[in-house]
Amino acid sequence: MNAPQKHSAPITVEVALGDRAYEIVIGRDVIASLGERIAKLRPGARTAIVTDRTVAKTWLKRTEEVLDQVGIAHASVIVGEGESSKSYAGLEQVCEALIAAKIERNDLVIALGGGVIGDLAGFSASLLRRGVDFVQVPTSLLAQVDSSVGGKTGINSPQGKNLIGTFHQPVLVLADTAILDTLSPRQFRAGYAEVAKYGALGDEAFFAWLEANHAELFSGGAAREHAVATSCRAKAAIVARDERETGDRALLNLGHTFGHALEAATGFSDRLFHGEGVAIGMVLAAEFSAERGMMPAADAQRLAKHLADVGLPTRLQDIAGFTQEGLADADRLMALMSQDKKVKRGELTFILMEGIGRAVIANKVEPAPVRDFLQRKLAQA
């Protein structure tokens, strides 16, 4: 893979969806162009900024300023932090606030936050007046490389993650890499799991580049922009050919079947961030693949080593409070995975691996080998 170049101008990636195509704009301080871009996209539109309390303290004023500079009217909706806001109560709060702000069909909702805010604001926009357009301004690494791109929106159910939702594409994504400087190390690492996922599922050269350059990526600079842009290009290409996840878009769920079950088992709490669940889930998927003879054991070890090298959890016992609340229970994890969105006619579908950069969709996976695998992993704790 070529070394990243220093960019004096933002990088633009197109999500090619015909008349619903949109741009992902990546670079430092691209948020400064938000007002001008909205004015061109929707002349005369009013806006509502949906964000959480933490992001509001740092970025709401700046966002309001760039809208004020071009005379765009704006309201603000502030919700609590974390997965607990991706709920029926959170959805009601946002929808009622948007209605009270008189946001109409020709107006715009701005999702200013991480993956939770993007999912919640996008879902609310998709329902409001049967569909209002929205803009993603992702403020976490995970959101910039994954959840802000592709149009998946939704909330969680007590029975599982993202079980209630819609496909609703944004009209613009602004990925300001300067915002990532404000993330905690743990938040940044969690987002990095999704970056590594793109290499693991379909681009061995990118994975090797990450192994060699992750320190520079974590410190900022051109490597960070390069990683975000490469990740967005990979996702945009898959979304363009399979928007509704009827085919190979499911590959983007590498690590998510195990990971979502672990998130649900921990109550969608900060005991396990989404990216951390994905990291453990990818390692479990790789190890399960190796046990089935699909993937060299050395590749599974290589994946686990890289994720551990950057400080991500890679084992079930790395989860805080591992033995609490029934987490160390294979039957409970199997029950949670049975609610996975990829399940078809009650049969499990997993994203497994044939090697680094070669993920495959495995349909009709028998539950008994999965349960046995989990029981053995749990016994190692």
Swiss-Prot record:
Alphabetical keyword list: Amino-acid biosynthesis, Aromatic amino acid biosynthesis, Cobalt, Cytoplasm, Lyase, Metal-binding, NAD, Nucleotide-binding, Zinc
Binding, Zn(2+): E194, H256, H274
InterPro entries: Dehydroquinate_synthase, DHQ_synth_AroB, DHQ_synth_fam, DHQS/DOIS_N, DHQS_C
Gene Ontology molecular function, alphabetical: 3-dehydroquinate synthase activity; metal ion binding; nucleotide binding
Known pathway: Metabolic intermediate biosynthesis; chorismate biosynthesis; chorismate from D-erythrose 4-phosphate and phosphoenolpyruvate: step 2/7
Zinc as UniProt keyword: yes
GO biological process: amino acid biosynthetic process; aromatic amino acid family biosynthetic process; chorismate biosynthetic process
Cofactors, names only: Co(2+); Zn(2+); NAD(+)
Localization of this protein: Cytoplasm
SUPFAM superfamilies: Dehydroquinate synthase-like
CDD domains reported in the protein's UniProt record: DHQS
Residues reported in the UniProt entry to bind NAD(+): 81-86, 115-119, 139-140, 152, 161
EC number: 4.2.3.4
Gene Ontology cellular component list: cytoplasm
Cofactor binding description: Binds 1 divalent metal cation per subunit. Can use either Co(2+) or Zn(2+).
Keyword Lyase set for record: yes
Catalytic activity: 7-phospho-2-dehydro-3-deoxy-D-arabino-heptonate = 3-dehydroquinate + phosphate
Principal localisation: cytoplasm
General function of this protein: Catalyzes the conversion of 3-deoxy-D-arabino-heptulosonate 7-phosphate (DAHP) to dehydroquinate (DHQ).
Family indicated by similarity: Belongs to the sugar phosphate cyclases superfamily. Dehydroquinate synthase family.
Name of the molecule in the record: 3-dehydroquinate synthase
UniProt source species: Rhodopseudomonas palustris (strain TIE-1)
